[in-house]
Swiss-Prot record:
Keyword Phosphoprotein attached: yes
Function according to Swiss-Prot or TrEMBL: Required for MAP kinase p38 (MAPK11, MAPK12, MAPK13 and/or MAPK14) activation during gastrulation. Required for down-regulation of E-cadherin during gastrulation by regulating E-cadherin protein level downstream from NCK-interacting kinase (NIK) and independently of the regulation of transcription by FGF signaling and Snail. Required for starvation-induced ATG9A trafficking during autophagy.
Modified residues (Phosphothreonine): T482
Species lineage: Eukaryota, Metazoa, Chordata, Craniata, Vertebrata
Gene Ontology CC terms: SAGA complex
Phosphoserine PTM positions: S284, S507, S512
Keywords: Developmental protein, Gastrulation, Phosphoprotein
The keyword Phosphoprotein belongs to this UniProt entry's keyword annotation: yes
Name of the featured protein: Transcription factor SPT20 homolog
Organism: Pongo abelii
One Pfam entry name: Spt20_SEP
GO molecular function, one term: transcription coregulator activity
Length: 522
C-alpha cells in the first residue's frame, strides 16, 4: 500500500520526443500528473480519477455514444455528424448482447470497424475509440429522463487489426506476404500501449492494482450473477411464467407458488394480557342430554373361557410333570444351544411352555429335582393347552430351529415326574438322545440312567391347526446371549374350569396356543 500511495502522490514524469503529436495514452498520463499536483478540495478525496471524462471535456473529442434504455426498449448507437447533429441507429434488444460484451471488456467490436471508418467525423484516436455510455435505466422521471454518463476506452484487438490489414490490402495493388506482415507489424506498433521496462517494484505493484480494480467485477461467478438479473434473463423468465411447466418441474412450480403465497400473507397476532380476554369456549353453552338408558349388551365384550382339546379326556396329574428338550447345533462356526421346557403342575390339566438359551453348565442343573431346577419368572411361561398341543409345539420348534441354523440339529430329551410326553409326531427323523431322570423315594436323590441313543420321528407341522412359533422368535432365542431371570413355575389350584383372567396373570396371552384357538372359535 505504501508503494502504491507513493506512486499516486509522486508519479514520475516522462520524457517525450519533440517530433510528432502526443497519443491518447500520453495525454492521459500528463493529465494524471497534473491532477496529482493539485490539492484536493476534500482531504479524503482524490483528484486523479475520471481522467477520460476530463480529457474529453478539455479537448472536445468525438465519441461513440451508446444509449441504454429501461425495460424492454433495448439499446442503440449514436454518431455525431459534421453539422453537430447526432444520428441514432435502430434500437437493438438486450437479448442480442454480443456488442455489450465487447463494451464490458473494453474492446473494439470488429462488427463496428467498417461502420466507424465510414463515419463523417474521425472517431479513432491512435486506433482506439472513446465510447460514452448513457444509462437511462436509473432515471425516475419518464417524461424527461436523465441519464448517468461514463466514458470507456475501446482498445483494438488482434481481430480488428486483421480486419484492418485485410481492408487495406484489398485494393488493386498486389501485396506480397512479406508486405502484409510488415503492415501488420507497423499497425501493432502504432496501436500498442507504451511499454514500461522499469525494474522497480512499484511498477509491478501498480500494474497488479490496476488489473485487480479492472477485473474484480469481471470474474466468472460475478458475471453469472449479473446475467441472472439482466434484462434478457428477466424477459425470458417472464415469458416462461405464462407457459405451463414441464412435467419434470411440476413439483418445483408448486413449491414456488406456495412460497410466494405464504410470503404475501400477513398475520396481525396480538397477545392480550391476562384478564383482558374472554374465553368464548367456556361461555359457549354445553347442551348434552343424559341418556335415559344405555344398551350394555351393545358395548360389552364377552370373553369366553379356555376350552381344552375335546379329542382327549382331561387328565388331572397327581404329580408335577416336566419335560426338557435341549436343541444343539453349530451354525456358522458358532455353537448354539436352546432349551424348551414343558410343564404340567399338580392339579392343573393345562400344559405350560418356556424357551430359554441353555449354557453348558446347565447340564448339572437338569439332575436336580423339579422344585429346585427351575426358578423362572411367571412372565416367561406361556400356555400351551392339551397334551396334543404340547407335542405340536415340540415339533414346530424343532423345525424352526433347524431352518434357522441350516444344519443338523441334535435334540436331547429329559423328563421328570410320573408321566411325560409319549412321543413326537411322525415325520422326518432326527438323531435325538433321551435322558430319563427317575427319583428314588428311599434315597431322596435323582438317579440318572442314560440309555443308548434312539431315533425319534418328528412332524413337519403341516397337520397342526396353527403355528405356535415364527422364525423371528426362534432366531431371537438362538441369539440371546444370557438366559432370562427365573423364579418358581406357575401353579393353578384344582378347579373344574379355569378362569381366563387368572390365566392371563400367569402367562402372556399372545404366546398361548390356547388363546389362539379361542380366537379361531370366536
Amino acid at each position: 500500500m505504501y508503494i502504491i500511495e507513493s506512486a499516486r502522490q509522486r508519479p514520475p514524469k516522462r520524457k517525450y520526443l519533440s517530433s510528432g503529436r502526443k497519443s491518447v495514452f500520453q495525454k492521459l498520463y500528463d493529465l494524471y500528473i497534473e491532477e496529482c499536483e493539485k490539492e484536493p478540495e476534500v482531504k479524503k478525496l482524490r483528484r486523479n480519477v475520471n481522467l477520460l471524462e476530463k480529457l474529453v471535456m478539455q479537448e472536445t473529442l468525438s465519441c461513440l455514444v451508446v444509449n441504454l434504455y429501461p425495460g424492454n426498449e433495448g439499446y442503440s448507437l449514436m454518431l455525431r455528424g459534421k453539422n453537430g447533429s447526432d444520428s441514432e441507429t435502430i434500437r437493438l434488444p438486450y437479448e442480442e448482447g454480443e456488442l455489450l460484451e465487447y463494451l464490458d471488456a473494453e474492446e473494439l467490436p470488429p462488427i463496428l470497424v467498417d461502420l466507424l471508418e465510414k463515419s463523417q467525423v474521425n472517431i479513432f484516436h491512435c486506433g482506439c475509440v472513446i465510447a460514452e455510455i448513457r444509462d437511462y435505466r436509473q432515471s425516475s422521471n419518464m417524461k424527461s429522463p436523465g441519464y448517468q454518463s461514463r466514458h470507456i476506452l475501446l482498445r483494438p484487438t488482434m481481430q480488428t487489426l486483421i480486419c484492418d490489414v485485410h481492408s487495406i490490402t484489398s485494393d488493386n495493388h498486389k501485396w506480397t506476404q512479406e508486405d502484409k506482415l510488415l503492415l501488420e507489424s507497423q499497425l501493432i506498433l502504432a496501436t500498442a500501449e507504451p511499454l514500461c521496462l522499469d525494474p522497480s517494484i512499484a511498477v509491478t505493484c501498480t500494474a497488479n492494482r490496476l488489473l485487480y480494480n479492472k477485473q474484480k467485477m469481471n470474474t466468472r461467478p460475478m458475471k453469472r450473477c449479473f446475467k441472472r438479473y439482466s434484462r434478457s434473463s428477466l424477459n425470458r423468465q417472464q415469458d416462461l411464467s405464462h407457459c405451463p411447466p414441464p412435467p419434470q418441474l411440476r413439483l418445483l412450480d408448486f413449491l414456488q407458488k406456495r412460497k410466494e403465497r405464504k410470503a404475501g400473507q400477513h398475520y396481525d397476532l396480538k397477545i392480550s394480557k391476562a384478564g383482558n380476554c374472554v374465553d368464548m369456549w367456556k361461555r359457549s353453552p354445553c347442551n348434552l342430554a343424559i341418556p335415559s338408558e344405555v344398551d350394555v349388551e351393545k358395548y360389552a365384550k364377552v370373553e369366553k373361557s379356555i376350552k381344552s382339546d375335546d379329542s382327549q379326556p382331561t387328565v388331572w396329574p397327581a404329580h408335577d410333570v416336566k419335560d426338557d428338550y435341549v436343541f444343539e447345533c453349530e451354525a456358522s462356526t458358532q455353537y448354539q444351544k436352546t432349551k424348551l421346557t414343558i410343564l404340567q403342575s399338580l392339579g392343573d390339566p393345562l400344559y405350560y411352555g418356556k424357551i430359554q438359551p441353555c449354557k453348558a453348565d446347565e447340564e448339572s442343573d437338569s439332575q436336580m429335582s423339579p422344585s429346585h431346577s427351575s426358578t423362572d419368572d411367571h412372565s416367561n411361561w406361556f400356555i400351551i393347552g392339551s397334551k396334543t398341543d404340547a407335542e405340536r409345539v415340540v415339533n414346530q420348534y424343532q423345525e424352526l430351529v433347524q431352518n434357522e441354523a441350516k444344519c443338523p440339529v441334535k435334540m436331547s430329551h429329559s423328563s421328570s415326574g410320573s408321566a411325560s410326553l409319549s412321543q413326537v409326531s411322525p415325520g422326518k427323523e432326527t438323531e435325538q438322545t433321551e435322558t430319563v431322570s427317575v427319583q428314588s423315594s428311599v434315597l431322596g436323590k435323582g438317579v440318572k440312567h442314560r440309555p443308548p441313543p434312539i431315533k425319534l420321528p418328528s412332524s413337519s407341522g403341516n397337520s397342526s391347526s396353527g403355528n405356535y412359533f415364527s422364525p423371528q422368535q426362534t432366531s431371537s432365542f438362538l441369539k440371546s446371549p444370557t438366559p432370562p431371570p427365573s423364579s418358581k413355575p406357575p401353579t393353578i389350584p384344582r378347579k373344574s374350569s379355569v378362569d381366563l383372567n387368572q390365566v392371563s396373570m400367569l402367562s402372556p396371552a399372545a404366546l398361548s396356543p390356547a388363546s389362539s384357538s379361542q380366537r379361531h372359535e370366536s
